[in-house]
């Protein structure tokens, strides 16, 4: 139900992959999630001694710059290979006149609904197509979604078993809110998501038994959940995980995430 009925279908389409960059400490991975759309992921190999696995960092504000982002830099310096990209309609691919009032992506999100393919579903397809481009490499994949991108990471993790560990930082705790959203994206809204797939804790449960880390979360108002609120919010989710395969931590800074990834 989540994939087809809610997100409009996120399975990568059989489009030819574009030519990758050379295997160097930094390379560009060019790929096409569907005809007419070309995206580029930048891969930075971890410093020696290199650790096994790759980490995909997602932000709906545009591509995370490894040299400018504390978490990305820490991951790189501790030997982890980091991949960053701008998803469609974000960052370098953003529509110049998209914002209306509280919604920075109002127009593109509205157009996606007209097409029957909610923007969140299109973003998940972008991620899954990148995984196709990486498939020649069998290293375990960790995906980290920052802020609103955490919901994208949750959906990608729920639908694609190639993602071994899903991490969200400061992301939405629940679609249900009695006040207008603050700091969120209209593109995260999909028709019938609550009716046919469930709320954020239900989406998070779909990732089990693979690893899931919730590193801080916010209400629709933008207010950060306390430790007690976080535990209560994801009580349903916890039931589907064994031991430390699920972690909910009110702190979402780089040091806290690094400790969890060890």
Language-model segments: residues:
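Cap/lid segment of the alpha/beta-hydrolase catalytic domain
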Residues: 50-140, 173-187
